[in-house]
């Protein structure tokens, strides 16, 4: 008990901190990183990319060589950069204000910024089950120190289904073995109880009939329950599969269990709470025991083919290699030798972890005859094995202190006068109320068996191991591709134990029976050359070989002293078995699948026994169906979005940006300016929301602390009530004893015994008090001790109440401090000068509207300029028709005096006549009618520009006052007749 100055202790377990935590620096770095990524993605929308200008070609072709010039581009770039910089400054200021507000001393720290989230799995796996508190629930709670039934939910009525996906995510298809301490505590209590009353029990006889047989026989049944926040996962469907196949020997290093369906419960199924060693169990346990007959998973395994493996795959629960049945902390419960049959280490004890995988299942006794396994009569006389399996305990079995027959119908029941609790033996005499000689046919029985070669995934058939001198070279008897992992690719034509050189370079011993059936393959990486060098170094084996001789079924080597080499007890190579002094007796040496070169004395590849388990191992096996979890259905933790979600969001943003229209810089500047004004209005609410959330988080945390303190008060009160109840039970027992004494005194007084010097009072029986002495707490404490514990409970409860009241006061204070949004804004900033700009809002809006109108006007003017430039490029070709004036005949003869036709080099001055306004209008109107603009309704307003274009053309040709004249040009005149000249209405023709 701690002192009153220290913090009061809790009755529940600690270690309930949030599973995930992040520092504020990590959060800030993450935010900055995401902001930089968004900026890189958005780069180029405002600057850095050239926007294409719209051009209009009246002739239907684009002027590829004409360079477009935007006179507003420098202004747009400069203004956009200025606005962008202002927005960046505003953003930095807002972030700085937010960080300053969150770093205030009276607010929660960055580590305390938490969120109430739902755990995706709903629970957390507990690997160290010895740290989990547990209690028992039974009807006989007054005798056993357990809780009454109803204190915990019934697992058959209240449970939660767990999906297969969550099971695979948490357990990775590996339902592990757990050495639970709960059964060990029960065994420790029984052992302590027997030791404290050992002297009294030695004086008893087998005629004494007591209620203690319910305890010994395991009739008191109950459940194991775990308190919140712990729970139990009860598997409903499971199967086993091999893992880590050894490529040298072919055995499975691990057999894993895959649970595909489970339920979360608070308590286990009902089971015997305590019992001594026994053979058969009650029929109430049959379903639970049968559930441990785990079948192989539906995968490609050789043992699933009954033609290759008669009987199919093995069924049962595989206790893994390396499991520790009794941990080091309770080594005093181990005893000298293991009492559990095949559940033992390599020395037959429980001190070391298991060296071989052990299977436990409910036995199938349908094929047994007179208490013996099938084909038992066909065994060799005196042998304890048949069909490759060595059986322990066939004939006589130990059951609840009695020797009974393995034949359930014989009814043999001999009392031994001893009880085995774990590895300790206690003399005890009792006459049980149950029928010892009953026919126990149909009762469930545990069967413990071991595959020493651990090749259960290949075959469930047990074989008798070959002796080393029966291993010979299989010349021509083995075909196919043989290996320790592929038995099906191998064929044999003769029974025997064939030494074969594998394709991988090692050696194989192929066991062939019935001239064609391969029952086993043992292998090693040692090649033939290395083995033969060892063989040649053996004494007197230079001229020997491993060839098969003899007419036996299996064959043998020629010289028994030159068999397959092995390492002797001195770890030296030898080829001969050890013999006696006279040389008449010779050791039987066998070859094992996992020890190819060792000195193996075990004849059979399997070991099995019936029964032999006490309540501790019975509970331990039934509890393997359960896994302890820590419920985290609603807990505090930091939410971290997965990377796939962030990538999906980034893709969505990019797709949305690609779908947006490409706008020019000035439009984006206007939009950003509007957004900046809106952001300035919303930034205040955002900061106020952050402040309000900060206060709210503090209040929620205070409420959580107050609730936790109240929970501690409830737990301490419950512990105190339990202690008071214990004192009341002691008081009841003592008062009952006093009443019995008073009653007897009154009876003796009526019988006139009062005149004696003392009353005729006999000693009362105290068996009832002895029944409860084995529990973990002592019920026979003195009143002074009980009062002292009550005072300690009261002091602890007072401290907890004060702490709870303080936490509640803090929670109420924090709850009252939560302000509304506007008060939070006033607290965060000084808004007296911030709202002065509101009077300029109308002017700002008018300015924005004016900018928009100006922008529209500039767009219209720009389009008009583009249209004018295109129309201005229309060219007309002037065709001058020169009509020769008539000349005198006498002059004609004079001009033709050179002997030519008079038209070879004649030049006239070009006579040019100016176009009238009507001619220009006709040409322009004809160009408009033939242009593609006339067919598009969006360009119809451009028709209003035609008069301006006509005036401009006329002024360009004639000048402002018509003073401009064309320069005279001399042109060649074709000498043609006037009748052949074209007749035109005017002098201008459009080309």
UniProtKB/Swiss-Prot annotation:
Residues 1-106 form the signal peptide. Glycans are attached at residues 140, 161, 206, 258, 298, 364, 381, 387, 403, 435, 439, 470, 475, 481, 491, 501, 515, 527, 537, 542-543, 568, 705, 773, 780, 796, 830. The record marks 664-665 as: Cleavage. Residues 731-747 are annotated as: Immunosuppression. It comes from Maedi visna virus (strain 1514 / clone LV1-1KS2). The surface protein (SU) attaches the virus to the host cell by binding to its receptor. This interaction triggers the refolding of the transmembrane protein (TM) and is thought to activate its fusogenic potential by unmasking its fusion peptide. Fusion occurs at the host cell plasma membrane. A lipid is attached at residue 864 (S-palmitoyl cysteine). Residues 107-840 are extracellular. Specific enzymatic cleavages in vivo yield mature proteins. Envelope glycoproteins are synthesized as an inactive precursor that is N-glycosylated and processed likely by host cell furin or by a furin-like protease in the Golgi to yield the mature SU and TM proteins. The cleavage site between SU and TM requires the minimal sequence [KR]-X-[KR]-R. One of its GO terms (biological process) is virion attachment to host cell. The chain crosses the membrane at residues 841-861. Residues 862-991 are cytoplasmic. Residues 665-685 are annotated as: Fusion peptide. Residues 697-747, 788-823 form a coiled coil. Keywords: Cleavage on pair of basic residues, Coiled coil, Disulfide bond, Glycoprotein, Host cell membrane, Host membrane, Host-virus interaction, Lipoprotein, Membrane, Palmitate, Signal, Transmembrane, Transmembrane helix, Viral attachment to host cell, Viral envelope protein, Virion, Virus entry into host cell. This is Envelope glycoprotein gp160. GO terms for cellular component: host cell plasma membrane; membrane; viral envelope; virion membrane. The mature envelope protein (Env) consists of a trimer of SU-TM heterodimers attached by noncovalent interactions or by a labile interchain disulfide bond.
């Amino acid at each position: 008990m701690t002192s009153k100055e220290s913090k009061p202790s809790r009755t529940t377990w600690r270690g309930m901190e949030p599973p995930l935590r992040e520092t504020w620096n990590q959060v800030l770095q993450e935010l900055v990183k995401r902001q930089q990524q968004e900026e890189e993605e958005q780069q180029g929308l405002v600057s850095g990319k050239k926007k294409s200008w719209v051009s209009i070609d009246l002739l239907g072709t684009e002027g590829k060589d004409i360079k477009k010039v935007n006179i507003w581009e420098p202004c747009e770039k400069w203004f956009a950069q200025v606005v962008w910089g202002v927005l960046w400054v505003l953003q930095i200021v807002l972030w700085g204000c937010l960080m300053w507000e969150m770093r205030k001393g009276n607010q929660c720290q960055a580590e305390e910024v938490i969120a109430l989230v739902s755990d995706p799995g709903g629970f957390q796996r507990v690997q160290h089950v010895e740290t989990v508190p547990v209690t028992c629930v039974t009807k006989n709670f007054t005798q056993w120190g357990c809780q009454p039934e109803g204190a915990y939910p019934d697992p058959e009525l209240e449970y939660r289904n767990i999906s297969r996906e969550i099971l695979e995510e948490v357990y990775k298809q590996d339902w592990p073995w757990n050495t639970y301490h709960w059964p060990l505590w029960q065994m420790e209590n029984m052992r302590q109880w027997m030791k404290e009353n050992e002297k009294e029990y030695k004086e008893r006889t087998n005629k004494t009939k007591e209620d203690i047989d319910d305890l010994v026989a395991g009739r008191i049944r109950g459940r194991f329950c775990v308190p919140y926040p712990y729970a139990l996962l009860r598997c409903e469907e499971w199967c086993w599969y091999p893992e880590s196949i050894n490529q040298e020997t072919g055995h499975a290093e691990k057999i894993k269990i895959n649970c595909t369906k489970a339920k979360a419960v608070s308590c286990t199924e009902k089971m015997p709470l305590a019992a001594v060693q026994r053979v058969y169990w009650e029929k109430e346990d049959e379903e639970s025991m049968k559930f441990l007959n785990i079948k192989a998973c539906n995968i490609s395994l050789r043992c699933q083919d009954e033609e290759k493996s008669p009987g199919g795959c093995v069924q049962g629960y595989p206790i893994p290699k390396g499991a520790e049945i009794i941990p080091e902390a309770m080594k005093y419960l181990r005893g000298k030798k293991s009492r559990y049959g095949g559940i033992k280490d390599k020395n037959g004890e429980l001190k070391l972890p298991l060296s071989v995988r052990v299977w436990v299942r409910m036995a199938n006794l349908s094929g047994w005859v007179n208490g013996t396994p099938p084909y038992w009569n066909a065994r060799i006389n005196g042998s304890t094995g048949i069909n490759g399996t060595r059986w322990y305990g066939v004939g006589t079995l130990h059951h609840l202190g009695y020797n009974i027959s393995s034949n359930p119908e014989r009814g043999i029941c001999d009392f031994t006068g001893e009880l085995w609790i774990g590895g300790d033996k206690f003399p005890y005499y009792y006459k049980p109320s149950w029928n010892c000689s009953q026919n126990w046919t149909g009762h469930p029985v545990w069967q413990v068996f071991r595959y020493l070669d651990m090749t259960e995934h290949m075959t469930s058939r047990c074989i008798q191991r070959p002796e080393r001198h029966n291993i010979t070279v299989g010349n021509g008897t083995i075909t196919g591709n043989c290996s320790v992992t592929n038995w099906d690719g191998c064929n044999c034509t003769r029974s025997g134990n064939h030494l074969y050189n594998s394709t991988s370079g090692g050696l194989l011993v192929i066991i062939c029976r019935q001239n064609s059936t391969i029952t086993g393959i043992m292998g090693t990486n040692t090649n033939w050359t290395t083995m033969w060098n060892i063989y040649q170094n053996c004494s007197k084996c230079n001229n020997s070989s491993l060839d098969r001789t003899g007419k036996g079924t299996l064959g043998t080597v020629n010289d028994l002293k030159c068999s397959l080499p092995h390492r002797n007890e001195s770890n030296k190579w030898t080829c001969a078995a050890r013999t006696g002094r006279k040389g008449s007796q010779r050791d039987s040496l066998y070859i094992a699948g996992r020890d190819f070169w060792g000195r193996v004395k075990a004849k059979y590849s399997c070991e099995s026994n019936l029964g032999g388990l006490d309540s501790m191992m019975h509970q331990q096996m039934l509890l393997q169906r359960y896994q302890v979890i820590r419920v985290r259905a609603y807990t505090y933790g930091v939410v971290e979005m997965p990377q796939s979600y962030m990538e999906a969001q980034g893709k969505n943003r990019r797709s949305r940006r690609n779908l947006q229209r490409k706008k020019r810089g000035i439009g984006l500047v206007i939009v950003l300016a509007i957004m900046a004004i809106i952001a300035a209005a919303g930034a205040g609410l955002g900061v106020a929301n952050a402040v309000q959330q900060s206060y709210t988080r503090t209040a929620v945390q205070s409420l959580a602390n107050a609730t936790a303190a109240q929970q501690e008060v409830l737990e301490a009160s419950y512990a105190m009530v339990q202690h008071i109840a214990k004192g009341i039970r002691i008081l009841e027992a003592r008062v009952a004893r006093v009443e019995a004494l008073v009653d007897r005194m009154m009876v003796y007084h009526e019988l006139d015994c009062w005149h004696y010097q003392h009353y005729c009072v006999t000693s009362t029986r105290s068996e009832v008090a002895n029944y409860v002495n084995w529990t973990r707490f002592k019920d026979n404490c003195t009143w002074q001790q009980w009062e002292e514990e009550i005072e300690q409970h009261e002091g602890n409860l007072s401290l907890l109440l004060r702490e709870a009241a303080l936490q509640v006061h803090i929670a109420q204070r924090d709850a009252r401090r939560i302000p509304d949004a506007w008060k939070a804004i006033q607290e965060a900033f000084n808004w007296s000068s911030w709202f002065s700009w509101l009077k300029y809002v109308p002017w700002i809006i008018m300015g924005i509207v004016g900018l928009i109108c100006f922008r529209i006007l500039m767009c219209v003017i720009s389009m008009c300029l583009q249209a004018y430039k295109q129309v201005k490029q229309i060219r007309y070709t002037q065709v001058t028709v020169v009509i020769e004036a008539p000349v005198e005949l006498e002059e004609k003869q004079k001009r033709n005096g050179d002997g030519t036709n008079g038209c070879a080099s004649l030049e006239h001055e070009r006579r040019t006549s100016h176009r009238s306004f009507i001619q220009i209008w006709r040409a322009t109107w004809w160009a408009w009618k033939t242009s593609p603009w006339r067919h598009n309704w969006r360009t119809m307003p451009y028709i209003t520009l035609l008069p301006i274009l006509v005036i401009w053309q006329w002024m360009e040709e004639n000048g402002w006052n018509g003073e401009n004249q064309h320069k005279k040009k001399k042109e060649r005149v074709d000498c043609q007749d006037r009748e052949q000249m074209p007749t035109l209405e005017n002098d201008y023709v459009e080309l």
